[in-house]
Amino acid sequence: KILIDCGSGVTQRLNQSKNSSADIDALLLTHLHTDHVIDLYQLIISSWHSDRDSIWKIYGPKGTKKFVDKIFSAWKIERELRISYEKRKSTNALKYKVYELKKNGSIKINDIKIKYFEVDHKPVPYAYGFSFYNNNKKLTISGDTRPCESLMQNALNSDVLLHEVFIEYEMNKTSKLRTKKTLHNVKEY
């Protein structure tokens, strides 16, 4: 199982869908915005509580190793207390290996070939989309992006395209107007 990003509530969503963080083979991060990584540490702790016995494989943009190291540093005392108090059979779930993605490339996780490619999520310097290949099927995930050539090229011939929506800052002005009008219309209905 592969998890893409770990935003707020990811552990709860996994549990609700009858999945366990202990069963995740790899974590792919599209970019390092909080809405995509805020629950990383909770995900890892939850996997340990679910008796995960393998080291985390985390793939992400440049800066991911430093980011994960800092999170683990911030929670070091709390983690050491848990380890000494809870006495679980393994601490492998609390270990990780980070693979920082280059500009464009591919990796293989189990039987799935994954092609990663840069997308345009300015001002973020490193943001990625992913195409997954398995059993002659192709799934492409855009990550946060504006329209860009790399996504259009990599999404070609996909069986499924999962595309995130990025709202331009300027759109907030019109969305507030539409929201106000919509709320007014709902009251009248």
Predicted regions and their residues:
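Binuclear metal-dependent hydrolase catalytic cores
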Residues: 1-140
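Cap/insert and terminal regions of metallo-dependent hydrolase folds
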Residues: 129, 136-138, 146-189
